[in-house]
């Protein structure tokens, strides 16, 4: 039996044979050129293998290779084999104009090769620089080989655009292509001052061979005037570019008005629908056709029944997805078609109608047209290929073992994975619905008439099995609940055989699952979190994914178990007995913490955040409550894979444990909803404050409205009594108003590592004195006293010169410290 590849190959060969049956067009002899001149450009880097090949006629008699008009010699690096030249371990001196000259009875022919061996390192940003080393420039440079020449611009037309406005995170390149004798030097200024790589985070690259400067991942602080100065001993020239970095404005996809357009075609015609999508975050595009199910176009939940005609694959480009092709349409193809595009912000859609009319009879003139034979040939080939495709589809449909309730099986794109559903699907037509998990939300049609959105039967969803992570349900023993939210819960469990090399080993784990009243959005978020944890990988200081149960039952996500709870409760439980505001002043703390222990906590969290940042993961909710502690006192960051709707944050709503999330948010996240690694650094600074107050609440007693005002005016929290000046300055650096001026997590890890190494294990905290400037360990119920001047966390007292360990800090008196 032929494979489908063989069948398609056979159809193509038949088509080619039919095409070859036509007489080939011929040109008169006088149309043949007597001599052809060709120029090819070749670029290479030092050490590359350079290969030049000359195309020859059959009757060629002699071949001669020259470089810059001089016979090309053969040596230990250069080998000439007739029509081919090979240069091993290329060097910049191998650059030049190569020529292959051939003679034959039919005439002579010369092919030119412009070769540039650049001394710059290979870079993806230099793809547009090939013209800088063209033969024209070399000829210009060679016109005055021994004369003194002041610097000059070689391509001034490429420097006409002076203002460059780009979105944040883009790569910017400024070029000043120049010439001169002797070869001039290049240096760059920013806003009239010397510009060094350490003047910006990430530095910059200079390509001296292409007279350019390259800055990756630009941020607003990169705005300014950039001046290139090209000079030698005979003169100096300069040129200034202006850079404006525009902050990204996240929004759901924008679809071009009027597209797709309505179509009216004859039976058997081909139809093309076009949908133009504009989106800053990567969009996911699907084409849908509205269908009827049991005589109805609308389901019991008032959403239309649709069939997914086209969805993005692994290698599908957005341009390909913007066009829907329908071949040989029938009356059944008539109806409403929808282009639906979504990104991490939301979804948008436009619809169009297809009307199919009876085909008109062909006129006799059409049958006698000179193109008739060609049409028959291509139609025959298309028919054969269509037959092969249909055969393959039928074969695959018969080979599948899954049963469907309707004629087709549809799929949902879920983080580059398909989640097949067992029933006909419906897609929400609400353009403003959230897609924070980055997936299309698809729901199964209900067999009953109930319109409830709840997942009464989560098992209706069939997730694809991932052998790397799948754990049989009979090897998971569920235990007591550890915690729960509105629609999800976490339980303690024992997993058998997580380690493939130790199939009988029992491991304590935590299992995330949905409650019975969870919605499809909750299921989508849980799947998204699981897939995110798979992609991020494992690290000692994050909660790692251990496995999952996705088959034959509800979804279980198996993660590491942290026996000592979250960091905030861990710190509060270890407050000294005499310390005010501890949960139970009469009980003995579980263990006494040293100053080094607290710095170690901060160091471990910074390491985890450094790893997440390296994986391009932005946490958005870093706080002590989202850091878990294992039995061995290892800090593990949790909830980094959660899908969060940042556009619907209730700034005045407390979390389940009474904390206000806004108190950990950076100003740009709070006011403009801009979340970056730098906004996570701000949250880390607040977490540092929590650590050195042993679980204190930030800004106690400060109303949200007042907090907004204080942050805008530059006020910051005062130094905790049990931290050094160096650590407090680290907090203040994290709270810098300009995001680009905050330290990176890499820098924080290095600084904290140094502090840990220099700190003695015996420096225990003297926390027996009241810390009345910090909040109690329970939800804020002291609003009347916390807002008083005696309880303010702000101060304008100058920083002490000596470390504040161990000593009793003076009470502040309501004054404010300005950043």
Curated annotation (Swiss-Prot):
S-S pairs: 54-100, 176-228, 275-339
Residue numbers annotated as active site: 621 (proton acceptor)
Biased composition (Polar residues): 781-790
Protein kinase domain ranges (all copies): 476-765
Glycosylation sites: 76, 116, 225, 238, 262, 294, 315, 328
Keyword Cell membrane attached: yes
Matching Gene3D superfamilies: Immunoglobulins, Phosphorylase Kinase, domain 1, Transferase(Phosphotransferase) domain 1
Signal peptide stretch: 1-21
Gene Ontology terms, MF aspect: ATP binding; fibroblast growth factor binding; fibroblast growth factor receptor activity; heparin binding
EC code: 2.7.10.1
Extracellular compartment residues: 22-374
UniProt GO BP: epicardial cell to mesenchymal cell transition; fibroblast growth factor receptor signaling pathway; positive regulation of cell differentiation; positive regulation of cell population proliferation; positive regulation of DNA-templated transcription; positive regulation of MAPK cascade
Region annotation Disordered: where it falls in the sequence: 121-150, 780-801
Membrane topology (UniProt): Single-pass type I membrane protein
Cellular compartments annotated: Cell membrane; Nucleus; Cytoplasm, Cytosol; Cytoplasmic vesicle
Regulation: Present in an inactive conformation in the absence of bound ligand. Ligand binding leads to dimerization and activation by sequential autophosphorylation on tyrosine residues.
InterPro entries: FGF_rcpt_1, FGF_rcpt_fam, Ig-like_dom, Ig-like_dom_sf, Ig-like_fold, Ig_I-set, Ig_sub, Ig_sub2
Biased composition annotated in UniProt, kind: Acidic residues: 124-134
UniProt binding sites for ATP: 482-488, 512, 560-562, 566, 625, 639
Oligomeric and partner information: Monomer. Homodimer after ligand binding.
Family label: Belongs to the protein kinase superfamily. Tyr protein kinase family. Fibroblast growth factor receptor subfamily.
Name the record gives this protein: Fibroblast growth factor receptor 1
